């Protein structure tokens, strides 16, 4: 069994809005279920720290940035779609074996072979 990767994440929000709170709650649930404590999440309120948003070129909130493991990935906007978040963090792809992935992209329209 390979050692678990440590995920370093930043979540940029704009104040204590319902959208920001929903993003944080959903993300926390995903992280606890998928990472089981092998992550670090830094929440950055761009209203309180606009210089951090400028340095990291954040143009919209919420924005989730995966710093480690590489490559760096960003998910911008609604984080309520669990599958979208997992794909953005490269977790869903890692869960698929090569055969599952190939069969899922090769078999949607089996009529095309005729």
From Swiss-Prot:
One GO BP annotation of this record:
circadian rhythm
Which CDD domains does the UniProt entry name for this protein?
KaiB_like
Query: Does Ion transport show up as a keyword for this record?
Result: no
Q: Which SMART domains match?
A: KaiB (SM01248)
Q: Which InterPro entries match?
A: Circ_KaiB, KaiB-like, KaiB_domain, Thioredoxin-like_sf
Entries under NCBIfam families matching the protein: circ_KaiB, PRK09301.1
The record's subunit annotation is: May undergo a major conformational rearrangment; in the free state forms homooligomers. When bound to KaiC switches to a monomeric thioredoxin-fold (KaiB(fs)). The active oscillator complex is probably KaiC(6):KaiB(6).
Another remark in the UniProt entry says: The kiaA gene has been eliminated from Prochlorococcus during genome streamlining. It has been suggested that the central oscillator in Prochlorococcus does not have to be as robust as in other cyanobacteria because the former live in specific niches of the Earth's oceans; they divide exactly once a day and at the same time. Thus gene loss and changes in kaiB function compared to other cyanobacteria, can occur.
Q: What does this protein do?
A: Component of the KaiBC clock protein complex, which constitutes the main circadian regulator in cyanobacteria; it may modify the ATPase activity of KaiC.
Free-text note on domains in this protein's UniProt record:
Has 2 forms, fold switches to a thioredoxin-like fold (KaiB(fs)) when bound to KaiC.
Q: What is this protein called?
A: Circadian clock oscillator protein KaiB
Species name: Prochlorococcus marinus (strain MIT 9211)
